[in-house]
Swiss-Prot record:
Protein name (database record): Holliday junction branch migration complex subunit RuvB
Region (Large ATPase domain (RuvB-L)): 1-181
Membrane-crossing residue ranges in chain numbering: none
Species: Streptococcus pneumoniae serotype 2 (strain D39 / NCTC 7466)
Gene: ruvB
Subunit structure, interactors included: Homohexamer. Forms an RuvA(8)-RuvB(12)-Holliday junction (HJ) complex. HJ DNA is sandwiched between 2 RuvA tetramers; dsDNA enters through RuvA and exits via RuvB. An RuvB hexamer assembles on each DNA strand where it exits the tetramer. Each RuvB hexamer is contacted by two RuvA subunits (via domain III) on 2 adjacent RuvB subunits; this complex drives branch migration. In the full resolvosome a probable DNA-RuvA(4)-RuvB(12)-RuvC(2) complex forms which resolves the HJ.
Length: 332
């Protein structure tokens, strides 16, 4: 069973996110630093009648990287071709996609860190000089074919920027770090979603829901759907702060946005290792989760909220973690 606080996409959420997707930067809530920079770069590219420099968007899942890619294409007034790293298995797959691009188009590659190296190497000349050299045939009859490409913009999205090779990363002229959303921005997103789907919600309820959504719009919208169910069955259909608190408590989402897995991580560190330091591998074994899952899905939010710290010796539970779970904390 999936966690309700999982920031990866679930079920019909892709369709829901397309419905909610803003079209232009002025409609995009949050990520102001990235938006402000992109606004300037896009306007400058349009004034020069050039393709926008290649863009790398990185950050945790669910923060709007795909949405931002579509917004960029809309702002430029061009078509967007969407694919993902795992789908492009060989160089020929990429060549077929590149051949379909029109001048100025946007090619969006999600999970770009998962591109095979053989495919990535084809991208280098395509990104830098808008051409590719490919080998046709095999053995003695093989020959090299030079293909010119129209100027285009590659937008790469990744949750693991550190896994990108240096040559690929260096070819992105624009980088945007997508960060967890501020409480006020997330509250506005919840209210916008409720309005689009004609849900009646109070501002206090939207604020409480945003507070417990881990700074992530995808999670906020998922929780909103579940709280709506509670409001229909246990109330009069109106989503207020009382029904929101009751629903999220029943869903094991506390006031800091932690669920049972997050709490299990913290309790394990405190009860079994006196708060740490404890190695990530050891911690993963104790909570029966993959090391990568802990590192990518759970740890970033716990660090961002100040519940754990990374040290040279391992992970350490903070005084805030002790206090939140009701343990007595003493300085080491």
């Amino acid at each position: 069973m999936s966690r309700i606080l999982d920031n990866e996409i679930m079920g019909d959420e892709e369709l829901v996110e397309r419905t909610l997707r803003p079209q232009y930067l002025r409609e995009y809530i949050g990520q102001d630093k990235v938006k402000d920079q992109l606004q300037i770069f896009i306007e400058a590219a349009k004034m020069r009648d050039e393709a926008l420099d290649h863009v790398l968007l990185f950050g945790p899942p669910g923060l709007g990287k795909t949405t931002m890619a579509f917004v960029i294409a809309n702002e430029l007034g061009v078509n967007l071709k969407q694919t993902s790293g795992p789908v492009i298995e060989k160089a020929g797959d990429l060549v077929a996609i590149l051949n379909e691009l029109e001048p100025g188009d946007v090619l969006f590659i999600d999970e770009i860190h998962r591109l095979p190296m053989s495919v990535e190497e084809v991208l280098y000349s395509a990104m830098e000089d808008f051409y590719i050299d490919i080998m046709i045939g095999a053995g003695e009859g093989s020959r090299s074919v030079h293909l010119e490409l129209p100027p285009f913009t590659l937008i790469g999205a990744t949750t693991r920027a550190g896994m990108l090779s240096n040559p690929l990363r260096a070819r992105f002229g624009i980088t945007g770090h997508m960060e967890y959303y501020a409480h006020a921005d997330l509250t506005e997103i919840v209210e916008r979603t409720a309005d689009i789907f004609e849900m009646e919600i109070t501002h206090e309820a939207a604020s409480e829901l945003a507070l417990r959504s881990r700074g992530t719009p995808r999670i906020a919208n998922r929780l909103l759907k579940r709280v709506r169910d509670f409001a229909q069955i246990m109330g009069n259909g109106v989503i207020d702060d009382i029904i929101t608190d009751k629903a999220l408590t029943m869903l094991d989402v506390d006031h800091e946005g932690l669920d049972y897995v997050d709490q299990k991580i913290l309790r394990t560190m405190i009860e079994m290792y006196s708060g740490g330091p404890v190695g990530l591998g050891t911690l993963s074994v104790n909570i029966a989760e993959e090391r990568e899952t802990v590192e990518d899905m759970y740890e970033p939010y716990l660090i961002q909220k100040g519940f754990i710290m990374r040290t040279r010796s391992g992970r350490v539970a903070t005084a805030k973690a002790y206090e939140h779970l009701g343990y007595e904390y003493s300085e080491k």
